[in-house]
């Protein structure tokens, strides 16, 4: 039984989702959004760090799965997103968690079956897979999807003997 923490990083809103991986599939544990407010960036990053560390200490996951940065139209936004990712990753590393990174299309492919799914499709599949009766906030549902992606990826690698096969820099390299 493994607990996986998924993080959808952001400098203003960071979604988190915790799932328990069992022999019967994945079960919902917790989810929510970390709202950092409107202060200076360094204060918001500190909120992300402290809050992710608190989620880890509360729920005790052994793995963190996080979305990779994508380069959009706005380089400043991508830099802030990367810094928020860094704050979450450092919190996880300080608590001894393994870290796995996934692209948005990998997450969508693993959860919905197509890398081009929209946020509502991801949200509906997360609800279905985790048997949720209410829609989680969109950032929280993205984080749950990232955790589910990690669980599905690990399950598909086990039969091939690839889990932990080659790790460099904290990422599984295939």
Curated annotation (Swiss-Prot):
Domain of life of the source: Bacteria
Subcellular location: Cytoplasm
Entry keywords, A to Z: Cytoplasm, DNA damage, DNA recombination, DNA repair, DNA-binding, Endonuclease, Hydrolase, Magnesium, Metal-binding, Nuclease
Biological role stated in the UniProt entry: The RuvA-RuvB-RuvC complex processes Holliday junction (HJ) DNA during genetic recombination and DNA repair. Endonuclease that resolves HJ intermediates. Cleaves cruciform DNA by making single-stranded nicks across the HJ at symmetrical positions within the homologous arms, yielding a 5'-phosphate and a 3'-hydroxyl group; requires a central core of homology in the junction. The consensus cleavage sequence is 5'-(A/T)TT(C/G)-3'. Cleavage occurs on the 3'-side of the TT dinucleotide at the point of strand exchange.
Gene that specifies this protein: ruvC
Impact noted for substituting residue 44 to A: Reduced cleavage of HJ DNA, reduced binding to HJ DNA
Protein name: Crossover junction endodeoxyribonuclease RuvC
Active-site annotation: 8, 67, 139, 142
Recorded effect of pH on activity: Optimum pH is 8.0 to 9.0.
Annotated thermal dependence: Optimum temperature is 37-55 degrees Celsius.
Main location: cytoplasm
Cofactor (UniProt): Mg(2+)
Catalytic activity as recorded in UniProt: Endonucleolytic cleavage at a junction such as a reciprocal single-stranded crossover between two homologous DNA duplexes (Holliday junction)
Cofactor note: Mn(2+) is a poor substitute for Mg(2+). Binds 2 Mg(2+) ion per subunit.
Ligand binding (Mg(2+) 1): 8, 139
EC number per UniProt: 3.1.21.10
InterPro entries in alphabetical order: RNaseH-like_sf, RNaseH_sf, X-over_junc_endoDNase_Mg_BS, X-over_junc_endoDNase_RuvC
UniProt-reported outcome of changing residue 12 to A: Does not cleave HJ DNA
Mutagenesis / variant outcome for changing residue 70 to A: Does not cleave HJ DNA, altered binding of HJ DNA
Family to which the UniProt record says this protein belongs: Belongs to the RuvC family.
GO molecular function: crossover junction DNA endonuclease activity; DNA binding; magnesium ion binding
Cellular component aspect of the GO annotation: cytoplasm; Holliday junction resolvase complex
